[in-house]
Amino acid sequence: KLFLLFDDFKPDAVINYAAQGEVRNSWKWPVEWYNTNCISVVKITEFLKDKNYLKRYISVSTPEVYGATKLNLSESHSYYPSTPYAASKLAGDLHLFTLFKKYNFPVIFTRAANVYGIHQQLYRIIPRTIIYLKSGRKIDLHGEGRSKRAFIHIRDVSYLTMKLILGGVNGEIYHLAPDDNIVEIRNVVDLICKLLNYKFENSTNLIKKNFGQDSQYSLDASKVKNLFNWKQSIS
């Protein structure tokens, strides 16, 4: 049905947001993660690679492919995936790179900081914290919430994605990340607790073990900032 829709609508741009995105669960069901994040990508792009109507394919990738690092990563950083989720996403990316090199497939890759905003999946840390607080449940913070992340609002991500559709370069990777520093997850939860008048200590379970997730990564987004003279609109 999807292929019929492609030929019916003949889109000049396709943005692939579809993915199995939960890192911890990728250890439980790696086959499903590879089927969605790699095999499905191969099937879709194998169909699209010969379509004259397609001018741009945006692959929404992930910085998890770099593994844990304290560096401010550029787009040329080497890959070191440490979870089935990251490895499955990288496998899909590498296939797309081969299509670009062989057929000049019009792919652009985006790798964003942690995205937040309206209609976010409820298992993500910000909506999950709010739901748990309101329902009287304690929030489990693996690794005691010491993992560090940067956050970018979906409006900024959407704006940059549209700019890349119109003015990006095929075969290139672009980091989408804010100007401010990365923060510990526990500090994000603590801020939400304060805004909703809850005590952090009474609302969280600090679990020492942090199974299957990178402790930290940060992205250098100067490439996209310089290309479009962009500054984040929401922080």
Residue ranges, per PLM feature:
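N-terminal Rossmann-like NAD(P)+-binding domain of SDR-like oxidoreductases, especially those catalyzing
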Residues: 1-115
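Conserved active-site region of classical short-chain dehydrogenase/reductase
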Residues: 38-46, 123, 155-158, 162
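Residues at the N-terminus of a long alpha-helix
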Residues: 80, 118, 150-153
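Hydrophobic alpha-helix immediately C-terminal to the catalytic Tyr-X-X-X-Lys motif of short-chain
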Residues: 91, 95-99, 129, 188, ...
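Short coil/turn segments at alpha/beta junctions that flank glycine-rich nucleotide-binding fingerprints
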Residues: 102-106, 122-123, 167
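A glycine/serine/threonine-rich, flexible loop-to-helix segment
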Residues: 122-130
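C-terminal substrate-binding subdomain of Rossmann-fold SDR/epimerase-dehydratase oxidoreductases
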Residues: 133-235
